[in-house]
């Protein structure tokens, strides 16, 4: 049995009782990485020397009885688009292959204050643009459940590392499903918080109105502990919300009697794998036995979500990625004859194909002749999608459906057709457009591959999302299943 089969609260108890040391936990992480990393390839950069030194320092503090934070001394993996002071941050892009940040993201400051130990930085789709982690500029991460399949994306390294037992939990970011989709594919728990619940300061921006940082964990309770540590207003992020952070762990009562669940007919319709559909219906039956009731509803504008998302996200990416020009930091071409040449060649040589595709799409949508026809219209449709969610939440507590239309697909299966790749996020994207919280929890298997159940909540009501997810988790054993590597 691995130490990381224990939950956060169990590991905390073991540390308090001195049955294990923090150094033991760090050793366990690097031992497991040595054992399986060659197969999974989740990490881009390891932080071994600093992690071991910090473990010794925290062990000394623990011996003096100085710390009671539940995350104190626990190892964590960090998606490589979250800046970490003194630890290389690449966004899985060659344009940032040598970028060494001089400051920590706010979430890193909060995790460091809680006493977590950063094991390393995790692979992802370049600049978080992708659904399979095949767009990384450096390496291919594989799904621990089937090494011939993708782990999902863009936080594929984070989900794969947790599923493979390399770390007990990790941070990811979610712009259109990039936490929830890989969590579903890898059979772990992933939460996208409400937009503004977690500071984005120090998250390398893809689409600023959609991005959110969130936890990927083995259990719902672990997820709640991590969100507790990173949530809250931040003066460095004007989009972070000054709304009190409740105690998420206290919300895990197991009681969902009388809860009203909405199930959008659009989320179980055409394109959803039959095995996935049956897994979700079985999960709803479990929730019914626990005292909840569900009804079918409609989110009529969901069918426009994919087009809306790719117009808006690509437009924001076009502006955000303009800063990577070879002038201040990162890659700079050696082949330029003049300044304009340097800009063009640096970006052409430094960015991968998918990033270039989205920059071009966004630049086109924002251009003067097409702004009203595309970007402005997409913003109006986004408002309609938000309104659909608001209308449903007037009558229901949560919305439930599958996280993804299918289980994990094979490596290389969708790379030649961007549209089929984009379709994989069709069930997660509306949540980002609406800015509401959503979690993916394991709810079954299709041909030995995990299936995710998506539970969507009202703005800043992560507590109810967690309560429902935890009740379902405790009534089943899917979260206890582990891949064999």
Swiss-Prot record:
One of its GO terms (molecular function) is ATP binding. Coiled coil: none annotated. GO terms for biological process: translation. GO terms for cellular component: glutamyl-tRNA(Gln) amidotransferase complex. It is an enzyme of class 6 (ligase). The active site is at residues 79, 154, 178. InterPro entries: Amidase, Amidase_CS, Amidase_dom, AS_sf, GatA. Allows the formation of correctly charged Gln-tRNA(Gln) through the transamidation of misacylated Glu-tRNA(Gln) in organisms which lack glutaminyl-tRNA synthetase. The reaction takes place in the presence of glutamine and ATP through an activated gamma-phospho-Glu-tRNA(Gln). Belongs to the amidase family. GatA subfamily. This is Glutamyl-tRNA(Gln) amidotransferase subunit A. The lineage of its organism: Bacteria, Bacillati, Bacillota, Bacilli, Bacillales.
């Amino acid at each position: 049995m691995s130490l990381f089969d224990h939950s956060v609260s169990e590991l905390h108890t073991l540390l308090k009782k001195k049955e294990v040391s923090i150094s033991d936990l760090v050793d366990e992480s690097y031992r497991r990485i040595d054992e399986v990393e060659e197969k999974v390839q989740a990490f881009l950069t390891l932080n071994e020397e600093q992690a071991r030194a910090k473990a010794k320092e925290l062990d000394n503090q623990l011996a003096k009885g100085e710390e009671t934070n539940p995350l104190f001394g626990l190892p964590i993996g960090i998606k490589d688009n979250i800046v970490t002071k003194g630890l290389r941050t690449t966004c899985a892009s060659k344009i940032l292959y040598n970028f060494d940040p001089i400051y920590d993201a706010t979430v890193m400051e909060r995790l460091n204050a809680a006493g977590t130990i950063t094991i390393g930085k995790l692979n992802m789709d370049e600049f978080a643009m992708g659904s399979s982690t095949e767009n990384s500029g450096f390496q291919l991460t594989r799904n621990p459940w089937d090494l011939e399949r993708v782990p999902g994306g863009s936080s594929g390294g984070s989900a794969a590392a947790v599923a493979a037992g390399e770390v007990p939990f990790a941070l990811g970011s979610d712009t259109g499903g990039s936490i929830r989709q890989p969590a579903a594919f890898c059979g772990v728990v992933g939460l996208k918080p409400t937009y503004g619940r977690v500071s984005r300061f120090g998250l390398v921006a893809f689409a600023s109105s959609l991005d959110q940082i969130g936890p990927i964990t083995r259990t719902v309770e672990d997820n709640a502990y991590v969100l507790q540590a990173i949530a809250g207003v931040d003066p460095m992020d004007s989009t972070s919300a000054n709304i009190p952070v409740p105690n998420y762990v206290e919300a895990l009562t197991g009681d969902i009697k009388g809860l009203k669940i909405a199930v959008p007919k659009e989320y179980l319709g055409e394109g959803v794998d039959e095995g996935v559909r049956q897994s979700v219906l079985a999960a709803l039956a479990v929730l019914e036995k626990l005292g909840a009731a569900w009804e079918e509803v409609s989110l009529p504008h969901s069918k426009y979500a994919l087009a809306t998302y790719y117009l808006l996200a690509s437009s924001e990416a076009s502006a955000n990625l303009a800063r990577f020009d070879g002038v201040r930091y990162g890659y700079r071409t050696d082949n330029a004859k003049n300044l304009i040449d340097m800009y063009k060649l640096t970006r052409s040589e430094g960015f991968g194909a998918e990033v270039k595709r989205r920059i071009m799409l966004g630049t086109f949508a924002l251009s003067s002749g097409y702004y009203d026809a595309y970007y402005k219209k997409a913003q109006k449709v986004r408002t309609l999608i938000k309104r659909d969610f608001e209308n449903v939440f007037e009558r229901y507590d949560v919305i439930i459906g599958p996280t993804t239309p299918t289980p994990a697909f094979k490596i290389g299966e969708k790379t030649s057709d961007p549209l089929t790749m984009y379709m994989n996020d069709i069930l997660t994207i509306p949540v980002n457009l609406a800015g509401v919280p959503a979690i993916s929890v394991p709810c079954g298997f299709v041909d030995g591959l995990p299936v995710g159940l998506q539970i969507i909540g009202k703005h800043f009501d992560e507590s109810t999302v967690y309560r429902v997810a935890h009740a379902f988790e405790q009534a089943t054993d899917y979260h206890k299943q582990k891949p064999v590597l």
